Amino acid sequence: MRKYEIMYIIRPGVEEEAQKALVERFAGVLTNNGAEIINTKEWGKRRLAYEINDLREGFYMILNVNSNSEAINEFDRLAKINEDILRHIVVKEEEK
């Protein structure tokens, strides 16, 4: 298992209830595929560096996880499909 940092941006028009459900759904995708979530940070609504689909803001979420590649691949696949996630990135943390 390796350490990863995942950041994703949720569309700003999503209601708070739906946003929480989306966060729980993607956390579930990771844990159901064998990942262990170490830390979750909600940065909240922030201005984007550039417009994405005519939107200037988004809700930022950051996860630190211990995971295998299968869980990361499944998260990546579902994040690409979901229209409420504007962007996402998965970074493998270097071992010290």
From Swiss-Prot:
GO CC terms, sorted: cytoplasm; ribonucleoprotein complex; ribosome
Superkingdom of source: Bacteria
GO biological process: translation
Gene Ontology MF, one: structural constituent of ribosome
Claim: Ribosomal protein is one of the keywords in the record: yes
Pfam families: Ribosomal_S6
Keyword RNA-binding belongs to the record: yes
UniProt keyword list: Ribonucleoprotein, Ribosomal protein, RNA-binding, rRNA-binding
Function: Binds together with bS18 to 16S ribosomal RNA.
Similarity comment text for this entry: Belongs to the bacterial ribosomal protein bS6 family.
NCBIfam families assigned to the protein according to its UniProt record, in alphabetical order: S6 (TIGR00166)
Protein name per its UniProtKB record: Small ribosomal subunit protein bS6
Species of provenance: Bacillus mycoides (strain KBAB4)
